[in-house]
Amino acid sequence: MELSLTTSIALATIVLILYKLATRPKSNKKRLPEASRLPIIGHMHHLIGTMPHRGVMELARKHGSLMHLQLGEVSTIVVSSPKWAKEILTTYDITFANRPETLTGEIIAYHNTDIVLAPYGEYWRQLRKLCTLELLSVKKVKSFQSIREEECWNLVKEVKESGSGKPISLSESIFKMIATILSRAAFGKGIKDQREFTEIVKEILRQTGGFDVADIFPSKKFLHHLSGKRARLTSIHKKLDTLINNIVAEHHVSTSSKANETLLDVLLRLKDSAEFPLTADNVKAIILDMFGAGTDTSSATVEWAISELIRCPRAMEKVQAELRQALNGKEQIHEEDIQDLPYLNLVIRETLRLHPPLPLVMPRECREPVNLAGYEIANKTKLIVNVFAINRDPEYWKDAEAFIPERFENNPNNIMGADYEYLPFGAGRRMCPGAALGLANVQLPLANILYHFNWKLPNGASHDQLDMTESFGATVQRKTELILVPSF
């Protein structure tokens, strides 16, 4: 009797599993705690059907805040507590300073030459210096203040023009506003193909979330083609590259004084002067970082802040009262007006605790074998720091799942990675270099949305009916659009 193809594959898989079990070498080495695993896929079956950050958090609560995950071929250690985060990101920071290679980084990020994915070494150190001194300095972030103020005011006018009492998609409005702010900061103006550019960036962000088969089986190159991932990424990259080339070509025609340089001006100046070893592809990779990562993280944070406030009317009333008392009927908000509003800042800090932009941070990779608390960690082992779990650790946070901005009153926790129980932007050498720009793109938009309008759910729904389901991508977004009704 002939066997069907499905039956043949199933039998072959069973034989392979039994062979792997029988021939697996024994080891006397101290092993990190881990869940039960299967041959070939390792621990992936524990994460099926879950948000990765939540699934990993639940495994850590069962097996320990320093545990091992086998993700296909990739050996991974997961850190889920402030204690271990501090140990690894201080004592072993340089050991785990590399980034694992990914198919997305290879194709989309111009062979991993952007700031986020570049391997640790001289090129990355120069990029980091470039960010600190030029691209993302306090002075440079401040120079974009007028852009933020203009685009926030444009959003206010658009909402008012739509009419009081009519539902609008705040998700769409916020994303568009942040994208325009960053587009103007990067290129000096809203680009003519901005809608297409934004859609391509959104697609890239969708492709970079979760655990991808191409990255968990890196040696199985046929899977890159079989899954269709390589073809999809290549197609996206071609469109993206054409658009950025057009932007750069148009930009060469214009001139800017150094005092008013856009991000692209800075990069092209450094490239042309040979001050810094930048190629045309390097410039494009860095610009993509600035626009892509910045748009997604800031817009998600503003959305989550408003979502949490809708579900917590007491906090909403308190933050709006603070804004309206301080601004006293002022029409257009300037950043100086909101620098000393404590409750607004508490709301932002609590939002970042519950909804860190990158809940699993960006994975790192071990550069050399290391002994970690008696455990032998092999070269190229992947490191995941679950900031989502750390920020909700009940040992450090009372009522950890609740939205309570007041918990940060008189709380010295540093938002920039100095306190390891609170790591919204990561910590150590590979901490997010754009934190200051990201915060600026959250604070003013949020203040405008809360100051100018009252908000409620459509169709008479009560505040506790707001769907807070997550959708995992490069960042954790709301699964459903935030549709609210403004009144003014």
From Swiss-Prot:
Principal location: endoplasmic reticulum
Domain of life: Eukaryota
Keywords: Endoplasmic reticulum, Glycoprotein, Heme, Iron, Membrane, Metal-binding, Microsome, Monooxygenase, Oxidoreductase, Signal-anchor, Transmembrane, Transmembrane helix
Documented EC number(s): 1.14.14.95
Reactions accelerated catalytically: (+)-(R)-germacrene A + 3 reduced [NADPH--hemoprotein reductase] + 3 O2 = germacra-1(10),4,11(13)-trien-12-oate + 3 oxidized [NADPH--hemoprotein reductase] + 4 H2O + 4 H(+)
pH-linked activity: Optimum pH is 8.0.
Known regulation of activity: Inhibited by cytochrome C, miconazole, aminobenzotriazole, metyrapone and clotrimazole.
GO cellular component, one term: endoplasmic reticulum membrane
GO process terms (BP): sesquiterpene biosynthetic process; terpenoid biosynthetic process
Cofactor(s) for this UniProt protein: heme
Localisation per UniProt entry: Endoplasmic reticulum membrane; Microsome membrane
The protein's enzyme class: oxidoreductase
Stated role: Involved in the biosynthesis of germacrene-derived sesquiterpene lactones. Catalyzes three consecutive oxidations of germacrene A to produce germacrene A acid. Could also catalyze the three-step oxidation of non-natural substrate amorphadiene to artemisinic acid. Can use beta-elemene as substrate.
Family label: Belongs to the cytochrome P450 family.
UniProt-recorded name of the protein: Germacrene A hydroxylase
Organism, scientific name: Cichorium intybus
